[in-house]
Amino acid sequence: MKVYHTSNSIIVNFDFSKIGSCGGVQVGEGMYFSHSLSLCEGWSVRLGTVTFCVVDIDAKLLDAKRFFAKAPEFIAWLDAYGYRDEEGYLKESVLAEFEASEDAISVLKSRFYKETTNFDGIDDEEFDNIVVWNPKSIKRITQISA
């Protein structure tokens, strides 16, 4: 699917079918999104092969995502799907599906976000990066290419 956005008089043609699950895995193939212009500029120079985009996400969706990730609703959602054990930890069977426990949390948060806020993507709070699969979530994009 191709989507056209304008930002600062720049028309950007995105092929969302090429967006990967995370920037590191899809270097040279996907697109990498961030709120930080300086972060995008720095990494586009370092990697030289990735299209970086500064994204203005619908603020209501993003705020809800960051709040819900730490809220009782997320815990209740985990319990409803049987992801946690009696002590409140993720079950070993759930963790076994992923290479690292951080991956499990990230994927489960993404599933929760999609169900509860209709935001289809990953919000990496540590680095303030966003990987977006649902173009309807995007309000404005500024493209930075190496």
Residue ranges and their predicted role:
Residues 27-31:
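Short active-site oxyanion
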Residues 34-36, 41-42:
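Extracellular glycan-interaction surfaces
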Residues 1-26, 44-146:
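Active-site and NAD+-binding cores of ADP-ribose-processing enzymes
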